[in-house]
Amino acid sequence: MSVLISNDAELDTLLDAQEVEHICGVVLAAEGVEREVEISLSYVDEDEMHELNHEWRGIDRTTDVLSFECDSAFDEDIPADETLELGDIILAPQVIARQAPGFGNSSADECRLMLVHGMLHLLGYDH
């Protein structure tokens, strides 16, 4: 598994790269994904997240996490030796940190939850 992390705005990401990779790996293992996957994780500021949420979901406000699935981890038509591009997760650390106390979480714990939430969306879960 590889996780490509971008943080162009140099935001406080709340989690380090090693923890991000660990969390993604735990989710993949729990869901029975045994093949090689690539995940993209981007940290964006609140304004950019607002724009993305409006553009892609038609919702004119910011949000904490967005996910965009590419290849399905369970697509049997993709050769087993090929790396799957699982998709993109976008996190807004400012939004996550602001909402965390309302859920009784630390900012880092809330970010962990949002990363798991995003991973589950990449694996086909919806709410």
Predicted features by range, described:
Residues 1-112, 120-127:
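An acidic/histidine-cluster motif and surrounding catalytic segment
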